[in-house]
UniProtKB/Swiss-Prot annotation:
GO molecular function: phosphatidic acid transfer activity
GO cellular component annotations of the record: mitochondrial inner membrane; mitochondrial intermembrane space; mitochondrion
Protein name: Protein UPS2, mitochondrial
Entry keyword set: Membrane, Mitochondrion, Mitochondrion inner membrane
One BP term from GO: negative regulation of phosphatidylcholine biosynthetic process
Start and end residues of each PRELI/MSF1 domain: 1-175
Protein encoded by which gene: UPS2
Subunit structure: Interacts with MDM35.
Misc remark: Present with 2910 molecules/cell in log phase SD medium.
Stated family: Belongs to the slowmo family.
Protein purpose: Required for mitochondrial cristae morphogenesis and MGM1-processing. Controls the stability of mitochondrial phosphatidylethanolamine (PE). With UPS1, controls the level of cardiolipin in mitochondria. Cardiolipin is a unique phospholipid with four fatty acid chains and is present mainly in the mitochondrial inner membrane where it stabilizes the electron transport chain supercomplex between complexes III and IV through direct interaction of their subunits.
Compartments, as annotated in UniProt: Mitochondrion inner membrane; Mitochondrion intermembrane space
Top-level taxon: Eukaryota
Amino acid sequence: MKLFQNSYDFNYPWDQVTAANWKKYPNEISTHVIAVDVLRRELKDQGKVLVTERLITVKQGVPKWIMMMLGGTNMSHVREVSVVDLNKKSLTMRSCNLTMCNLLKVYETVTYSPHPDDSANKTLFQQEAQITAYGSIRKLCNKMEDWSVQRFCENAKKGKMGFDAVLQVFSENWEKHVDDLSNQLVSKVNETMEDVKISAGTLLKGTERSGRTILQQNIDLFRDAYNHEN
């Protein structure tokens, strides 16, 4: 089993980074990721936790000796389950390969959290992958694991560059996006208040009409009761 670890900083606040994460693919640099399909989304803890399950399709060059040995293709699928926790301000993404998993198993964990040195403006990215090859020939398994670690390192560099490009575009539109969202919220609140006013006015008028109707229908009874008292 081989272990790959990686970490770096993003010069953007956690809110922006985690929002841009859903726009990470496709990008012009991480071309090995060709499709991302959402399988499931679920809100928990009164809307404070978002769980997302995705299927990621990857296409990249594979050495001929691996292709010959495994009899596979250069296309692979990865299952990813992510959890966004607004209370803890954390995004945790866990994934494992579905293709040729009986011969090579890759478990990856990625976390995004506010940077401990500058939580308001920076985000800490941490990545860990456990890579295990299965086979009777230990030397061949080691070679496969070493190649996988090298490929992870290459893809990590591409991923950082690609996500930086996405974040730059996203950041330029972030303020406008927040302003638009705020305007929509204010507009919705105003519409709701107007609806409440209209409903209250209608209810008041209806109550007044009902009161007049009751008086009109029972005027003789009220008159007799008044005369009786006098």
